[in-house]
Amino acid sequence: MEFLLGNPYSTPVGQCIEKATDGSLQSEDWTLNMEICDIINETEEGPKDAMRALKKRLNGNRNYREVMLALTVLETCVKNCGHRFHVQVTHRDFIDGILVKIISPKNNPPTIVQDKVLALIQAWADAFRSSPDLTGVVHIYEELKRKGIEFPMADLDALSPIHTPQRSVPEVDPATNMHTSQTQKRDSFSNLSNSKSTSTPYTAPGGPPPNVGGPISANSEQIGRLRSELDIVRGNVKVMSEMLTEMTPGQEGASDLELLQDLNRTCRTMQERIVELISRVSNEEVTEELLHVNDDLNNVFLRYERFERYRLGRSAQNTNGVLSDVTEDNLIDLGPGSPAVVSPMLANTAPSNLSSQLGGLDVGTNSVSSTLSALPTTNPKDDFDMFAHTRTNSLADQRKNVTYEDPQALGGLVSALDVRKQNIGGIPVSQPSDMDDIEDWLSKDLKGDELEEGVTSEEFDKFLEERAKAAERVPDLPSPPTGEPAQPMNPAGRKKQESSEDKLFAL
């Protein structure tokens, strides 16, 4: 295609675009940009030649410095050229085939390039939505939104409108400028520091300055004063930019935020005066400096607006978070006297306040403390005496039926009771007659043992004879293979065994 149509940079407007988008430029050449707009408006093939040159510079270019300069030229031309150029720009082939391809993920462009392209598409879609022959960009914009592409937030009311003004640099005889009134020039330059501020929005980069009056020229002294004042503006822009870089939205200090807002108001007032001078000063060098300062102001204003949006959004999130925390704490309502309903403010109070709050809780009559206090209190000493008395009486009743063969066991039991009494020590017995009852019981057992005599040898022989006769009447049984015959149990021993079992059952 290039072979048939020739080099896009060979045309007059193509040469200007090649120079204006050269990557070696330190900043935008606004004089050259406005000259490109004039050529497009005045020549028949200007719009087509300009689009060919811009496509060549944008298509597949990985030098994003040149891409940003080309996008600035494109934006300037759209705002300063007519319908013929708009038709070329809003065509679907250019928007989808060139601009959208620049921000594709495979090219991995910088964020500033992505934001610039998306902002241009969004602004053009909004401006040309009502024009039937310029809706190609509108369709691309809607498709990108359906795909989930997030466009940067932009205050469309604060941006300059897309229109085609008259020629920005009128053709005036240079000799006419020499006859300009000195009073008019002095009043023009004094506007930078003495004019009152008005609430007019700032213009976007590349926006056309309004025509306020006729062109004026200034002497070296006035230019020096103007440049010194521009240095002050640059200093304010630098301070504001550094503050925006250092500050975090939602975490800024009150004094820093107040200073930043003051700088924003001051810089906006200065920009209004700069925009007024851009259209009236005929010195190209001064005009270029004014345009550069205006562009810096626009950039820092965009950063400030983004900072404010993030700050307000963060503060709104924090407010919603606090409200939701309070709501969650009060979900369970246990009544006005419930200790579970504690607000977040009470959690950080001093321990004394917490103690006073706990002390003021209303405890009902059915609580555990009231129930325990209502129980009858007994002396532990009385409880032990009652237990000892019960054990003593039951033991005395059981001992009445027990017989002993060995009189020495009597002394052992008495000594054991004495030891038990010594171990109990300082616990007094409620009734002093208990020990007397035990002694009486032991004396009765002793008398019973004395009356009971052992088995005599005659009785034992008689018992053996009876057993032998009984054994003769019983049929013979096979004797066990080993072991001795069982010994007959003595009736006295059987009695002792039965008494021991009774004692165990009683215990």
Swiss-Prot record:
Region annotation Disordered: where it falls in the sequence: 164-219, 466-507
Domain GAT residue range list: 221-309
Record's keyword annotation contains Lyase: no
UniProt motif (Clathrin-binding) ranges: 330-335
Family as reported in the entry's similarity comment: Belongs to the TOM1 family.
Summary of the function given for this chain in its UniProt record: Acts as a MYO6/Myosin VI adapter protein that targets myosin VI to endocytic structures. May also play a role in recruiting clathrin to endosomes. May regulate growth factor-induced mitogenic signaling.
Protein name in the entry: TOM1-like protein 2
